[in-house]
Amino acid sequence: IKVVEMMDDMRNHVKDWGDRDEVKNYLEQLDDKQAFDRKGLIYGMGHAVYSLSDPRARVFKSFVERLAVAKGREKDFALYSMVENLAPEVIAEKRHIYKGVSANVDFYSGFVYSMLDIPLELYTPIFAIARIVGWSAHRMEELVNMDKIIRPAYRSIMPEKAYVPLEER
């Protein structure tokens, strides 16, 4: 919801959505706690594990673009893309963080929900529905592994097994 609200605020305060400097200036104001909710955050940017890029977001973006074209929302998509490209630059300059910050998968999800005419009140429940299986699986792993946190970057040491289709099991 915060990404959607931030982008709505940006649309209301940035006159020319195609002006890179004007969009960057707004992002700098966000970072300086001078715009939107004054928290100093650019919502939808960064991830605890995926610092260089969120592979889910890269895949999702191509589908978002196709939906935006189908729904006649290319200008909105262009603004989201510009923010995705400029935000890491602003964060690096303002916070002196150079390890890499990228859009996470949630950066575009609210935009998709709006294109599908899903009410804002359902965004958070949909967010939870999409993650509950993963959260549950991680909790079960933690219980089995004595509260050791499982990270996606871990490599399995198990021998590789061939996939067996359900019909053959």
Model-derived features with residue positions:
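Non-transmembrane, aqueous-exposed alpha-helical and coiled segments at domain scale
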Residues: I1-R169
